[in-house]
């Protein structure tokens, strides 16, 4: 059994403790971009996300969440980054920049911390369409010592609307060619960011499409 294999591995190793984890029934994932700057720590509106084979494909902001979930998610993200920044400052560093905090929302509504990326996050590309300052602008300003306040991370999309980003993944070998760009950009509320990647070898994320819709259904249609 798995338990016996775990015990055998522990007996063969040079450690005396093991970690036993319970099954966490996952419903969905959230990303909370958290910014540490000279003005302190602020959190962005939670971002919903969808993955394929463990890789980002789509994200949207604000995430669709029950009452109170957004604030609980932001509190967890803030606490995690506060701890990281405290360690950085104890080592003589500033700890400034954007942190992508990933969270698990379980089927019972509870929220678990998953991991944190000390940099702009792929799911955060949606902020190029949703916020006053994108995650990239926030990161640059923060590490340059400029203050970041809640006003800097405010959503700028119309009330009740949703912004979304979708990764454009190209399969093949050689140069990538984009077609029908004009038709895609003719749709109101859309944008396209093509990355400066000259070639594809296998599967590679080559661009991201951005859109703003009046609702999550509208976002999906766009």
Model-derived features: positions:
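Active-site nucleotide/adenylate-binding loops and adjacent lid/helix of ATP-dependent enzymes
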Residues: 1-85, 188, 213
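Short, well-ordered beta-strand elements within core beta-sheets of diverse protein domains
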Residues: 22, 126-128, 209-212
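Short beta-strand micro-motifs enriched in acidic
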Residues: 35-37, 104-106, 195
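Protein kinase-like catalytic core scaffold
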Residues: 42, 99, 111-115
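Short, flexible active-site loops
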Residues: 54-64, 115-128
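Active-site "cap" helix and flanking loop/linker of ATP-utilizing ligase/carboxylase catalytic domains
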Residues: 71-101, 107, 117-174
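Peripheral (often C-terminal) accessory segments that flank ATP-dependent C-N-forming ligase machineries
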Residues: 141-219
């Amino acid at each position: 059994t798995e338990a016996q294999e775990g015990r055998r591995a522990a007996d063969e190793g040079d450690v005396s403790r093991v970690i036993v984890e319970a099954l966490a029934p996952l419903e969905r994932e959230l990303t909370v971009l958290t910014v540490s700057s000279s003005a302190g720590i602020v959190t962005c509106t939670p971002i919903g996300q969808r993955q394929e084979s463990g890789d980002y494909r789509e994200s949207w902001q604000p995430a669709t969440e029950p009452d109170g979930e957004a604030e609980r998610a932001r509190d967890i993200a803030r606490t995690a980054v506060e701890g990281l920044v405290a360690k950085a400052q104890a080592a003589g560093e500033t700890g400034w920049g954007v942190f992508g905090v990933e969270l698990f929302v379980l089927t019972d509504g509870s929220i678990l911390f998953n991991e944190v990326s000390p940099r702009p996050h792929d799911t955060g590309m949606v902020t190029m369409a949703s916020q006053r300052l994108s995650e990239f602008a926030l990161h640059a300003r923060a590490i340059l010592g400029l203050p970041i306040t809640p006003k800097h991370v405010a959503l700028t999309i119309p009330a009740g609307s949703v912004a979304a980003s979708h990764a454009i993944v190209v399969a093949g070998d050689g140069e990538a060619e984009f077609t029908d760009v004009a038709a895609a950009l003719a749709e109101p509320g859309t944008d396209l960011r093509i990355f400066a990647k000259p070639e594809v070898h296998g599967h590679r994320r080559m661009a991201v499409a951005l859109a703003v819709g009046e609702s999550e259904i509208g976002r999906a249609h766009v």
